[in-house]
UniProtKB/Swiss-Prot annotation:
Further facts: This protein has four functional calcium-binding sites.
Residues given in the record as Ca(2+) 2 binding sites: D57, D59, S61, T63, E68
Keyword Calcium set for record: yes
InterPro entries in alphabetical order: CALM/Myosin/TropC-like, EF-hand-dom_pair, EF_Hand_1_Ca_BS, EF_hand_dom
Family assignment from sequence similarity: Belongs to the calmodulin family.
Name by which UniProt lists this protein: Calmodulin
GO molecular function: calcium ion binding
Keywords: Calcium, Metal-binding, Methylation, Repeat
Binding site for Ca(2+) 3: D94, D96, N98, E105
Amino acid sequence: MADQLSNEQISEFKEAFSLFDKDGDGTITTKELGTVMRSLGQNPTEAELQDMINEVDQDGSGTIDFPEFLTLMARKMQDSDSEEEIKEAFRVFDKDGNGFISAAELRHIMTNLGEKLTDEEVDEMIREADVDGDGQINYEEFVKMMMSK
């Protein structure tokens, strides 16, 4: 399944993997998964985290390595983001609930994920998704961006 991914997708997923793999040891533990999920406003229990890891942990190590992560991402892309997941993600980004994701909200989320972005990088991300040019991302623009990934 992971062999259907392009090199660009693999390198994007490698970047995402490093965000999760806080200590850089090449595996994602339940603790690391929990940290990332909490920074995104989720509050999973230890058992839920273990279930998530067990779902993709093919070698029974109790952690997720990069090949397992790729398989998970390929699977996720196949049953493509359901509308509910996209709505949920939009709500996480849209901190003040006004129906738009501003540069400040985007920067806040990315910083929580451990991504230190310059103002230029954040503005560039907004510009890429901002179809109507109002300087922020509305729900329709967000859906388009998520579907084109």
